[in-house]
């Protein structure tokens, strides 16, 4: 999806809804049995107290749900990293966002590309008060050496999620290419809950004015 209008990708939910629907439908046509809302940046927007974030959450959920209607595909409310700010903690931000999605009817939640687990379990506890049967997946962005950009090792992060009793699936995504991620997963071993793996297609290489993954 190129040429997204607005300063944030999520703004396309309102400025180009048909374009976002087309992306969802393309995944479904390719055989996807789950899609995620175009809302990765909402926690960051909520932390900055951007007045648009709630409307973008609503629009993002509606577009994904409409695209999946009439299929067996699951729809995941997608949440990227939430920063701690002077005004709001990561836990407060995540909690506000998941409660918004819960009010819209979301049953599946994906916290992804995280460098730490700060605030995640607090938000999941709050979510389960409203949606006790929610499916929650948490995924960390880990470098090939096993550490996130905040210096936390994936083994400790995955173990905390698996041992919490609050998370249904845990895993790794982004940053590392398939070979490196395979090695990390082998090092993790059995974790007791389903393990998700979503590697990068490769590593970005800038050639003149283009970015290619190799």
What are these regions (language model features)?
Residues 1-214:
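Domain-level signal for soluble alpha/beta catalytic cores
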């Amino acid at each position: 999806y190129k040429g997204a209008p607005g300063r944030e990708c999520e703004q396309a939910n309102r400025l180009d809804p048909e374009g976002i629907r087309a992306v969802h439908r393309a995944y479904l046509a390719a055989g996807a049995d789950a899609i995620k809302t175009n809302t990765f940046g909402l926690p960051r927007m909520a932390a900055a107290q951007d007045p648009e974030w709630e409307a973008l959450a609503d629009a993002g959920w509606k577009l994904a749900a409409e695209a999946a209607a009439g299929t067996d595909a699951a729809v995941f409310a997608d949440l990227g990293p939430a920063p701690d700010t002077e005004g709001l903690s990561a836990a407060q931000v995540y909690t506000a966002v998941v409660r918004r999605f819960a009010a819209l009817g979301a049953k599946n939640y994906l916290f992804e590309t995280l460098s730490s687990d700060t605030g995640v379990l607090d938000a999941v506890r709050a979510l389960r008060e409203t949606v006790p049967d929610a499916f929650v997946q948490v995924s960390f962005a880990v470098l090939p050496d096993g550490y996130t950009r905040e210096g936390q090792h994936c083994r400790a992060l995955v173990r905390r999620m698996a041992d919490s009793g609050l998370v249904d699936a845990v895993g790794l995504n982004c940053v590392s290419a398939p070979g490196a991620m395979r090695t990390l997963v082998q090092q993790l071993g059995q974790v007791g809950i389903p393990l998700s793996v979503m590697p990068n297609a490769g590593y970005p290489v800038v050639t003149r004015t283009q970015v290619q993954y190799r």
